[in-house]
Amino acid sequence: MIFTVTEVTKMVNGVRTVVLWDRDIQEGQLVEEELAFWAQDDSGNVWLLGEYPEEHEGKKVSAPAAWLTGIQQATAGILMRAEPKMNTPQYEQGKAPRAEFHDLANVFAENQQTCVDIGCFDGVLVVDEWDPDQQPQDGHQFKYHAPGVGIIQVTALGGDEQETLVATEHRTLTPDELAAANARALELDGFGYTRAKAVYAGSPPAELVPRPAR
């Protein structure tokens, strides 16, 4: 999996979101590409307002699991609380009935030390995620969030098709790489108007909003 934060934004249900571009590459082949639409509120909570995943099967490309907040009863959810703590109520990360997406989460552990390929990290937060609409045996995912980096590891408990991931690289893109990522995110968003018409029809196109130079 390759996760890229782009300079592309998209208005979703009246909220300007940042567009993330994810790629799932297996044995050198692109299996899935996804746009995820994130936003942060004034309190510091990070929200998920929609996803546009494209599934690649040979030359066939489809997007059956696309969803946007406010369309087809889909609702936004919190990806990360501003001040995540243990022993607090579980929270919803989003719900989209037509896309069969529904995730709940809770803080499982705080201030952990976790070592992966890119190094060892202190202060790691472990978040337990699960789909309440699935059977208990379908399992849980545990995502390890390192301060200033993001997710560095994903482990699983139960389930036959759970993903496990370990971070192998974390870096800033070159200007050319960032430009290419922006272009691909805009292209994928454009595909949404033909491959996920029912979801995308009423949404404005994504647009490039370059970050201020540092």
What function would you assign to each model-found segment?
Residues 30, 47-48, 65-70:
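Generic detector of bulky aromatic hydrophobic side chains
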Residues 1-42, 49, 55, 84-214:
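Acidic, serine/threonine-rich low-complexity disordered tracts
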Residues 46-48, 58-61:
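Beta-strand-rich cores of mature extracytoplasmic or soluble domains
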